[in-house]
Amino acid sequence: MFTQGSFSSEVTGTTLTNMEVTVYDSISAVPVYGDPALQGSTLPRVIAVYSDDQTVRAAVSAALGKKLPGEEREHKVLDFATADALRQYLGDKRKVDLFILDGEAVPEGGLGLAHSLKDELIDCPPIMVIIQRAQDSWLAKWSGADAVTSHPIDPFTLGSKVAELLQ
């Protein structure tokens, strides 16, 4: 699947030697969806936030900050305004460690998207959905969501739930 060894390059006019690299021999070997080989890694975790409402995406990003409570490792928040953009990102075999999906998003709601992701992705990362009404918690359960939070975004609740999901 991959090989490790030394690497020399003169791309920038500088020769890099004795650099440890991992070379993947196929697209299927690219680390995706919380690859166990990356456990203990210092790479930032990737949190994908989906909502058609920019204020919701901004509130989630602000609540998460750069690091979660009790975490030394930073994370990277990626905003997606459409489900199609999120699917395209995933179709490019890019890594995601956690999804946060707005159940109130239109035209495709986060609950339906969560259900689709759980069905379509092998080893799907954890999914948190944001709901407007407590009565919608049964829909969140149906969707396969691993956690639920509600509007308006509470930074303390969101941060602690996300930290729990990423452990």
Where are these regions (language model features)?
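Alpha4 helix (beta4-alpha4-beta5 surface) of REC/receiver domains from two-component response regulators
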Residues: 132-149
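A short, hydrophobic beta-strand element within the central beta-sheet of small alpha/beta folds
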Residues: 99, 124-135
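Acidic, metal-coordinating helix/loop segments flanking the phosphotransfer/catalytic sites
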Residues: 79-98
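Conserved acidic segment of CheY-like receiver
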Residues: 44-65, 99
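Short hydrophobic/Thr-rich beta-strand motif most characteristic of the beta2 strand and flanking loop
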Residues: 71-81
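Conserved phosphotransfer microenvironments
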Residues: 61, 96-118
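C-terminal output helix
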Residues: 153-162
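Conserved phosphotransfer cores of two-component systems
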Residues: 91-94, 118-123
